[in-house]
Amino acid sequence: MRKIIHCDCDCFYAAIEMRDDPRLVGRPLAVGGRPERRGVVATCNYEARKFGIHSAMPMAQAVKRCPDLLIVPPAMDKYRQVARQIFAIYQGYTPLVEPLSLDEAYLDVTDSPMLAGSGTRIAEDIRRRVREEIGITVSAGVAPNKFIAKIASDWNKPDGLFVVRPEQVDAFVAALPVERLFGVGKVTAAKLRRLGAQTCGDLRGWGADRLQQHFGSFGFRLHDLCRGIDHRQVQPSQIRKSVSVEETYATDLRTLDDCQRELTILVDQLAARVERARAGDMIHKTFVKLRFADFRGTTVECVYPQVALPVFNRLLAQGFERRRMPVRLLGVGVRLHETDAHARQQALFAEGPPPGA
């Protein structure tokens, strides 16, 4: 049985700013661009979150919600330096560290000799060292796979640890609302609820074929996740260049209206994937992919820095117009800035790899 830890620094950028300037502690704080320059919130502390402020929110909207909000511009060089220090700590326990962003990573400690191989003790020690050596807090989840470990790390935030042991997986996942499943956004969750599935336990009553009938190939993923099954490996060198979702339909989509109805579901799934990948501020382009009944395909894309349904609808219309034929496959996605993707995952070690790497 694997031992996977998901580590997630609490409000990373804001935590570093509060560490470096104690006058900011206890006051609502957002890191991001100025509202007059149409800036957005990169992250905010928990005092700001009490006002409903969250990452990716336009800063002007954040200031309306909290007129006393303190705004600090991002200091990316400083954040990368802190990330290097934190990842050096991770690498001291296992070489199997998969960066998801500057502030988030998976660790596979299955074969680690540290602390008698206890995933719980390793997570506790990592949190202690980051707090004492770096001066910020990390929340961690320990579980037999990546899906459950990521959910667990969010369970006792901030500055928390939650462990899901192998014998607890079944009951833990059964009680989860369907919204917690990877790739399920608002539209998909609403469809699941209309079909009578409120929790993963409810969803287990559905066979894989029935889920596939309603949700296409994503139905097979739902079938596994609602049972706590996730075979993805921790991949230390993974660099994400795009995020996408596509579906091949058992019955061709004959009209543009048919395509637009399905597009809404796909965009919802894409938004959920982008959010979980922490890739929202790395988007460079958006695209729509179509494969027609004659198996010929086309892709339409444009420069646009966020997931927005109207933009995808416009691209879909352009692509559909090219052939005006029934569509057998539909896909949506975003392309990421390659330099930013490197900065998020590889430039952590731009000044040389951490000890043990």
Curated annotation (Swiss-Prot):
Compartments where located: Cytoplasm
GO cellular component: cytosol
Gene Ontology MF annotations: damaged DNA binding; DNA-directed DNA polymerase activity; magnesium ion binding
Record: active site: E104
The keyword Ubl conjugation belongs to this UniProt entry's keyword annotation: no
UniProt-listed Pfam families: IMS (PF00817), IMS_C (PF11799), IMS_HHH_1 (PF21999)
Residues involved in Mg(2+) binding: D8, D103
Keywords: Cytoplasm, DNA damage, DNA repair, DNA replication, DNA-binding, DNA-directed DNA polymerase, Magnesium, Metal-binding, Mutator protein, Nucleotidyltransferase, Transferase
Positions of the record's site feature: Substrate discrimination: Y13
Role description: Poorly processive, error-prone DNA polymerase involved in untargeted mutagenesis. Copies undamaged DNA at stalled replication forks, which arise in vivo from mismatched or misaligned primer ends. These misaligned primers can be extended by PolIV. Exhibits no 3'-5' exonuclease (proofreading) activity. May be involved in translesional synthesis, in conjunction with the beta clamp from PolIII.
Family statement: Belongs to the DNA polymerase type-Y family.
PANTHER family: DNA POLYMERASE KAPPA, DNA REPAIR POLYMERASE UMUC / TRANSFERASE FAMILY MEMBER
Assembly and binders: Monomer.
The name this protein goes by in its record: DNA polymerase IV
Native organism taxonomy: Bacteria, Pseudomonadati, Pseudomonadota, Betaproteobacteria, Burkholderiales
Gene from which the chain derives: dinB
